[in-house]
């Protein structure tokens, strides 16, 4: 088998918050195939062209490559996209994105933590830079760390400009945010335990109405309802990688 610093989000400490409902027994890869249309596929069977923004080819772009053009953060090797973020040098995690364009739909990604750096993690999800009132268009993400998986609605959570300013004001004054504000922010995410390894995994991340779901190896491991997931246009699919991750295959599907 073929083988933005992870953006500091100014979040409250991530407590483990279990979903109120057990994740449904369903096959979201089959849902995408049966109900949707595949609008993009990349198996990375080529060589990249240099280190700059469009070097990966096939429509991929990097928001961070130009910060350190002398350092290669994405390497195509034997059909694998090997991401090694120059986070310290760039002052930002490697941020790689591709056009998407759907309301409901999702992505299927084959990935691996190669074990080349400590604390390997992967953030992947959806962006709409045309959205007003949301920092950098950040909509919603799945985040895989060494010990947990997070689903998070940024559009109506901490990346909402009003919420972001309110939190920054508390930090500037060195005040603890009030309980109602913390409760609001915490309601915009769900965190479930997960133990990372160095094996290949098939990941499915979908948006269906106001729900986001993440599956690993054909099993839904996290689901969460929040109004931001229903944003009508997920224009970009993006990876944010603070260290090292290998990507073997990416498919983007549109259901509507």
Regions found by a protein language model. Name each.
Residues 29-30, 93-100, 188-195, 236-237:
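Beta-strand-rich interaction surfaces with strong enrichment in secreted/lumenal proteins
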Residues 215-220:
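Short strand-turn-strand beta-turns centered on an Asx-Gly dipeptide
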Residues 83-172:
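Secretory/extracellular carbohydrate-interaction modules
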